[in-house]
Amino acid sequence: MSEQNNTEMAFQIQRIYTKDVSFEAPNAPHVFQKDWQPEVKLDLDTASTQLADDVYEVVLRVTVTASLGEETAFLCEVQQGGIFSISGIEGTQMAHCLGAYCPNILFPYARECITSLVSRGTFPQLNLAPVNFDALFMNYLQQQAGEGTEEHQDA
């Protein structure tokens, strides 16, 4: 066999944790007496930090705002963190891992936390749809490449 500089990729979840939680219902209790037809806004953000060689913290911030007209019914924010051991990849592959793969792992935990908080606030059940972090990451890369560049698709 020919000699290759073949570093094997390794990925391990060390810990998943809730880093920060906030729930506000600024217009309770009178908001409970209104017809429940909210406008729900979902904001997502990710951040990653290298903690040590091959050890990274990824934080997924999920903010949900439900409004009835001009009034905020509730505002819920969860920062779901994870510590991951990742080795054998670099560059765009590492950026994809930290910006899409890890958030895909963290999102169900954040979604469950938000659902629980909304329920404890006695609001109707909130079911957040799955998020395609791979597509969001690709959009981010395209934005970074600048407007007017040709789109590339992976085969």
From Swiss-Prot:
GO biological process: protein folding; protein tetramerization; protein transport
One annotated Gene Ontology cellular component of this protein: cytoplasm
Principal place of residence: cytoplasm
Location within or outside the cell: Cytoplasm
Keyword list, A-Z: Chaperone, Cytoplasm, Protein transport, Translocation, Transport
Signal peptide, first to last residue: none
GO molecular function annotation: unfolded protein binding
Record-linked Gene3D superfamilies: SecB-like
Entry-linked InterPro entries: SecB, SecB-like_sf
Subunit structure comment from the entry: Homotetramer, a dimer of dimers. One homotetramer interacts with 1 SecA dimer.
Function: One of the proteins required for the normal export of preproteins out of the cell cytoplasm. It is a molecular chaperone that binds to a subset of precursor proteins, maintaining them in a translocation-competent state. It also specifically binds to its receptor SecA.
Family: Belongs to the SecB family.
Protein name: Protein-export protein SecB
Provenance organism: Citrobacter koseri (strain ATCC BAA-895 / CDC 4225-83 / SGSC4696)
Lineage: Bacteria, Pseudomonadati, Pseudomonadota, Gammaproteobacteria, Enterobacterales
